[in-house]
Amino acid sequence: MKLVIVESPAKAKTINKYLGDEFKVIASFGHIRDLPSKKGSVLPDENFAMKYDISDKAGKYVDAIVKDAKKADAVYLATDPDREGEAISWHVAEVIKEKNKVKSDDFFKRVAFNEITKKAIIHAVENPRKLDANLVNAQQARRALDYLVGFTLSPLLWRKLPGCKSAGRVQSVALRLICEREDEIERFKSEEYWDISLKMQNSNNELFTAKLTHVNDQKLEKFSIINEKDAKDLTEKLKSQNFHVDKIEKKQQKRQPQPPFITSSLQQEAARKLGFSAKKTMQIAQKLYEGVDIGKETIGLITYMRTDGVTLSNDAIADIRKLIDKNYGDKYLPNSPRIYKSKVKNAQEAHEAIRPTNITYTPDSLKEKLEKDYYKLYELIWKRTIACQMENVIMDLVVASLASENKEYLAKANGSTIAFDGFYKVYRESVDDEAEEENKMLPPLKEQEPLKTKEIIPNQHFTEPPPRYSEASLVKKLEELGIGRPSTYASILSVLQDRKYVSLEKKRFMPEELGRLVTVFLVGFFKKYVEYDFTAGLENELDEIAAGKLEWKAALNNFWSGFNHNIESVNEQKITEIISYVQKALDYHLFSENKESKACPSCKTGELSLKLGKFGAFLACSNYPECTFRKSIVSGNDNNENDGDLAATPNENKVLGTDKDGIEIYLKKGPYGPYVQLGEQEGKVKPKRSPVPASLNQNDITLEMALKLLSLPLKIGIHKDSGEEIMIGYGKFGPYIKYMGKFISIPKKYDFLNLSLDDAMKLIEDNKAKLEKKQA
């Protein structure tokens, strides 16, 4: 009997049907050994000896493996084709050797395959190799590094920053990215700027829009027009100008398809297009790889999903090109196959890209056989794979340059059309944080053609802070920085959320107070080890180990000598010194720039400062014990030592920017919720305030939104039939339209701050009967 060992029962079930009766396929159910979560599992003083344990959960599976191995003529180790898979195979072999007294390595045969198909399985079994010690060593080095950081840094964190749970080698760097982005957002001050649009009409009475680009030979930069007065003055001057088409430029642009998916690009695209978390994407991809039931049989539908490689096998390319020719026609098929180059350093790990194992299994043919989410992910992979071998998209681009009579004013109008849809026929990649491009066409225009100016529109804008990271953009950033590897991204994001260091709001990462405390501490006292370059450098070292170019224990020793010294140094630091540093670093976040926000709200004479208790960080009054005011800065901490009214309200006086007169606009939080305020209170004169509607997230309030809230009730236009004003406002029952003395509620589906005149008139018309009834 020949024993085949894989990780999962699903994989075992699929493989079993491809092998004859002489083979028995069983599952290890993942790792059978690991480093126990206790001190002494890695011993730096003993040349980094690693003490592995078989977990209670794995015990029964190990017994079955050992029992079957005793009866076997050979053991085929058929775990996944990466470092983790190689390590699982090595651990299985080591346990069998130890339990069954096996001395010869020839008893073990490593079989690796990139897809679970009959052809791939038979080929792998007929061409076994030995275990790759370099891949095993790279995995052991990663595991040792993670253990050494976690089990030396975390206890230090508990002592120096009570309430903080843990720190990790890679997760802490990802957390730093999220926290630093939030710092940027908090410190950001929005600036006003304007541009001028011209609605033009050609000689055939066709309309198009141009944008003013030059005034008196001076190019208009982003901040050339910074206030309403300048914009209106320029608008008035333009009213007397006659424009013509000065020049027309036409060109074609080619767009090439993206490479087939690797792990990180699949996670990003599934997040953008399908709304899947990285964890969900990998769970579904794992099932599609291991095998799913599609009726009469269980088959692996995609190739291995943890890969950095963008190459496709020659057979796969031939099948893809054949399908393109058959289904879409030869005009969509390039003359030669597209070849994509992989950036993977180690050829042993350079797997194929993620693709369907059989391209003829179209999404339509599987729609009724797959679960909904499985179908969605498979369709995404199938379409990307087809598109990567299709012809370019060809765009016709037109730029029309417009000029006034004396060329004092210049404007430009851009248009584009798709001349040939190429790979767009099948697939278009999403773009994170960008508005969808419009396929904007221009009417036919001729050089020197006179134009009529139908409307001149001054457009007000405000600069916006950088967006918070989504799962897609964070994975992309980690990949760009070289931090982590495809197989680790999903777990990194999950750990940060599980430990309450970050939360997801509207699919964007926000740091929790606990996460900010940890980041400030690590940046202050372990800066080298949360530097992006250093962490990326360690990943490169692991790649070097996997390629056999670096000795793994030498790499561990190089890391540990410096890290251990850093641990010992921080252990000597007094907690008061650490608190002082942390408060200074978090000062802006906790108190903004307003010194008054440090004043104790209870006694009015004391000043708030950061303190650490057994349940975490809090703000306390300097007049203690006379004043016992305390305020938790850790949201959701039910075990804190705080008084009853101490809800987490850090950064209560955030400055959003200034209005046109230079008066600061604040976002504040009061007893009835968040509100925006124009300027500070002077004496008994209260500044203008406006509540933030419950439908809006206070963390998303921009200067532009605040100015609109403060301007309510606001006139949005004149009704075209009655000539009466239409106003919008916000009252105790929510947003409303005021028209002819009557009030109409604005439904939640509308963004009431940006309600158009057309939408307002439609709502008035829809409520006409109700209004007439009230009037009667």
From Swiss-Prot:
Named cofactor requirement(s): Mg(2+)
Residues engaged in binding Mg(2+): 7, 80
Stored CDD domains: TOP1Ac (cd00186), TOPRIM_TopoIA_TopoI (cd03363)
InterPro entries for the chain: Topo_IA (IPR000380), Topo_IA_2 (IPR003601), Topo_IA_AS (IPR023406), Topo_IA_cen (IPR013497), Topo_IA_cen_sub1 (IPR013824), Topo_IA_cen_sub2 (IPR013825), Topo_IA_cen_sub3 (IPR013826), Topo_IA_core_domain (IPR023405)
One GO cellular component term noted in the UniProt record for this chain: chromosome
UniProt EC number: 5.6.2.1
Keyword terms: DNA-binding, Isomerase, Magnesium, Metal-binding, Topoisomerase, Zinc, Zinc-finger
Signal sequence region: none
Residues the record marks as active site: 304
Region feature (Interaction with DNA): 166-171
Gene3D superfamilies: 3.40.50.140, Bacterial Topoisomerase I, domain 1, Topoisomerase I, domain 2, Topoisomerase I, domain 3, Topoisomerase I, domain 4
Gene Ontology biological process terms, A to Z: DNA topological change
All residue ranges annotated as the Toprim domain in the record: 1-111
SUPFAM superfamilies, per the entry: Prokaryotic type I DNA topoisomerase (SSF56712), Zinc beta-ribbon (SSF57783)
Molecular function as annotated in GO: DNA binding; DNA topoisomerase type I (single strand cut, ATP-independent) activity; zinc ion binding
Enzyme class: isomerase
Family: Belongs to the type IA topoisomerase family.
Subunit structure: Monomer.
Function text: Releases the supercoiling and torsional tension of DNA, which is introduced during the DNA replication and transcription, by transiently cleaving and rejoining one strand of the DNA duplex. Introduces a single-strand break via transesterification at a target site in duplex DNA. The scissile phosphodiester is attacked by the catalytic tyrosine of the enzyme, resulting in the formation of a DNA-(5'-phosphotyrosyl)-enzyme intermediate and the expulsion of a 3'-OH DNA strand. The free DNA strand then undergoes passage around the unbroken strand, thus removing DNA supercoils.
Listed name of the protein: DNA topoisomerase 1
